[in-house]
């Protein structure tokens, strides 16, 4: 079940899920049962502990609060229930690749904010081995008739890839940095072309240990790092930026 208590919890609802949980075990005792809980459900509610393992849909850093509240939520749950298997069944932030900003912020639908949000979420997961799984919402932008936001009516834009499957947003590549063994470098913010600042931030994602940045064909700087590499580059006109590893 997904967010089954979104409209409230009743005795019938709980009893029905007890029956379903028992049926699942009867059909295949080797497979654990699980539920995806809406974030409003108290983490100490008995329903949370009905299945063998459980996950929560949390949107701190997008719909509510700040992204570090995800960290605090999991730390508190694990402290109170150290033997309970817990995961993250939904999380995400909307982004329209046409929206660019030098100072991305929550709620601006910018590609840059989505990227830094997912940077945080992946580090949170990597730092907490007790989180059994995270399920990013979503791989692709998808149709949502009731939505009219972020410049694209009828779409949920939480995907790491656009609705037409043609454009990988910057956030796609931070997942590649964590999860892929295929060597790569990716310069973020490439759609942010018209920049007004005299010094601009260039961010590179890579699964390689060292990245070298070239500006107008000349080596600018090299960095050793882990997945995220940041450079400050003076700009005064049109420039060509290249990253190599």
Language model features with spans:
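Extended substrate-binding grooves/exosites of carbohydrate-active enzymes
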Residues: 1-224, 232-244
